[in-house]
Amino acid sequence: MTIKDLKEGQSATICTVGGDGALRQHFLDMGVIPGIEVKLIKYAPMGDPLEIRIHDYELTLRLADAEQIEVSDKKSDEDEHRKDNKKDKALVEHPGLGEGGKYHVKADEHPLPKDEILTFALVGNQNCGKTTLFNQLTGSNQHVGNFPGVTVDRKEGMIKGYPDTRVTDLPGVYSLSPYSSEEIVTRQFVFDEKPKGIINIVDATNIERNLYLTMQLMELDIPMVLALNMMDEVRENGGSIRINQLESMLGIPVIPISAIKNQGVDELIEHAVHVARYQERPGRQDFCDPEDHGGSVHRCLHGIMHLIEDHAENAGIPVRFAAAKVAEGDAEMEKSLHLEQNETEMIEHIVSQMEEERGIDRAAAIADMRFDFIQRICRQTVVKPAESKERIRSRRIDAVLTGKYTAIPTFILIMGAVFFLTFNVIGAVLQNLLGKGIDYLTAQMDQLLTAWSVNTVLHSLVIDGIFKGVGSVLSFLPIIVVLFLFLSLLEDSGYMARVAFVMDKPLRKIGLSGRSIVPMLVGFGCTVPGIMASRTLPSERDRKMTILLTPFMSCSAKLPIYAFFATAFFPKYKALVMVGLYVVGILTGILVALIIRKTLFKGEAVPFVMELPNYRMPALKNVLQLLWEKAKDFLQRAFTVIFVATIVIWFLQSFDLHFNLTADSQNSILAVVAGLIAPVFAPLGFGDWRISTALISGFMAKESVVSTLSVLTGSMDVIHKILTPASALSLLIFCLLYTPCVAAVSSVKRELGSKWALVVVFGQCVVAWIMAALVYAICLCF
């Protein structure tokens, strides 16, 4: 019997974990090991993937992967352990180790030089509050979400009040096995940068799974502290953790904190600075019990340590960590050690003997050794409530949001509400108010310049260039901020992870996994972070496909274009046209995905293995910070890139080839240059040189399409003369699909290289031309 054969709500005990390679190791690292109880929660609305509960957290996997995990009806002893823990809820005083700790021996101090920078690596599982803690430590405003893998790159900052420190926020990982790009980045940072200390943040509500990474970090023999986050939730749900007993068993300082409430952070900083300054390394790194299963794993690890000791020292890798990785079959580690053939053969002999004695394979044996140690710790130090309030709430919400018959309609309803409120209600009202304010300021400035008899050239620059150009873009700020507000709320609440779960099966039909939905949804806000979010995908194939498809998801910078032309040509159907453009972008992306799946990216999507976090109320501070960052970014672009582009466009439009001021813009430098490419767009219905100019400026920033047209035409009457409703709709389709802005192209280049960046630029222009020509031809038939 396998997990696939279980019924919803049925529990069983894992017997064997099949499969091979990095995926199997990833399963083991996440606690899917023999002897552990697993419960099938539900199937996705379309029947695949499924959701299981293991180690007190929810995990998703596909049916094909579930078939690889054999289970039996035998019950686990976990409930008995939980009952034993509830007998004593006595809390132990704190602190014990670290700064001010009663176990600290002053005579053993060997501090680093005072002028040496203390570097820290902030490491933790995905979705454990790591970025929130980083913001508290440094005062930064990094994006905080409730989706596994929000941190897609390492970020650095100085700890507040400690100018001689530098802390790096690394991507969330479940282990230091090289399965995903995040794990590779984290592992390489620790090996290459050699931080003076590690701050390991652990989700106290799910401590058992989180401690697996803690054990691997301790094997690195780097001074570290453990930040026990979300302790407020543990206490509220009737649980507790014996801090000093946990410290004693781990041999590192343990500090209870609540990152979101900024509780315990000051104490954490004191401990972290202390252990780094005095290089107080973990008190233990050996977690294998000599008596466990006849001591087979213990003998194996210590035998390997003896063989590779010199190689590990030469490679700068802690010998205990290296031995554990070699024992579990980490090929990258074996390459790093440069072992001789006879040494490799000896290690294989030692491992084979251990597997024979232990009765399971090498990777499962090492994972079981770690989880066995973790369970012993948790039985003695952790008092768990029966079920947390957050879990109960999440289960009730999921009954609707991921229900078999309600998930898809609810998703459509939620996204429809987001667009309706953005374009028709909140965003539209605020846009009208801001637009009136800008018009008033423009009129006042025009009167002032006229009263002062300012030179006509300068007058034209200020009014026709700056105010009309930049002002036309600024009026769309409310729509963009409102859209980001809703996307932020959906991500922070944990709903995005459910969307990935629900949409995995349909996305697999176009060659992607459910996790790809999140970068593409983020792309509706801005393509750049959407492309960066693809780094959380463990497959290089999926990552490339997702990056190439994300620009087809219409970003918020195109909203000014849609609103401008929809208002001008389709005022009665403004909302319908704008929503329709988003649908066309999605459908075009699907079509492109089907084509490249059969040509450039043959093969199957990466397995869908993802944690489903509990729903959480988005923190007002985090949401406001995100909105401020997005608004500030938009304003900076409006007063830098768009401002400069507007002035350049005005200059080229106002002077001829001999740099004489021209009254007729058709004789301008701009008209001559743009006229060379205008014929390319003639079959699409917008062969006017002014439209060509606006499209070129849109490569710098999409918002500048509107500002450029405002400068070149001067009034809406001129735009109605050069465009018909059919050509306007064709132009909207082209703007929707043609090359993304230079910032997005730069992101593609950074992620995939120059070749793929050029593919995006020219490929999307070709797709946009074909689709626009098709729409224009259809419109002419009616």
Residue map of PLM features:
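Conserved G1/Walker A P-loop phosphate-binding module
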Residues: E93-S175
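Conserved C-terminal guanine-recognition region of P-loop GTPase G domains, centered on the G4
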Residues: Y162, R187-P253
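Canonical P-loop GTPase G-domain recognition
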Residues: V234-D289
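Extended helical scaffolds that flank P-loop GTPase cores
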Residues: Y278, Q285-W452, F659-L670
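Extended, low-charge hydrophobic alpha-helical regions
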Residues: E357, A364-D368, K384, A428-I466, ...
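Hydrophobic core segments of alpha-helical transmembrane domains in multi-pass membrane transport
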Residues: T410-L421, L483-S488, A566-A568, L581-I595, ...
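Juxtamembrane inter-helical linkers in multi-pass membrane proteins
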Residues: K436, Y440-Q444, A497-T527, K602-L626, ...
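Transmembrane helix-loop junctions at the membrane interface of multipass transporters and ion channels
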Residues: S556-V579, A743-L752, A772-F782
